[in-house]
């Protein structure tokens, strides 16, 4: 089975974080989700055994 990851750029208390949510067949695998302060570190972690399917910048939607 192929694992997919969506990476979200979010802002928590004025700090940017990149959160990866891992899925198999649209079911989130919460214990494999990962977060870090850099996109590169997050992508490197999930690319070990996942395909990145989406990148969503949630900071652009904040008002």
What are these regions (language model features)?
Residues 1, 59-63:
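Short intrinsically disordered terminal tails
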Residues 14-32:
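A short, structured beta-strand/loop element
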Residues 27, 34-59:
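A short, charged, amphipathic alpha-helix used as a generic interaction element across diverse proteins
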């Amino acid at each position: 089975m192929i694992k997919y990851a969506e990476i979200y750029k979010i802002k928590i208390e004025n700090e940017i974080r990149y959160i990866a949510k891992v899925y198999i067949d649209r079911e989130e695998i919460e214990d494999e989700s990962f977060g870090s302060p850099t996109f590169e570190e997050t992508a490197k972690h999930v690319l070990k055994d996942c395909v990145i399917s989406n990148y969503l910048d949630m900071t652009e939607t904040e008002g």
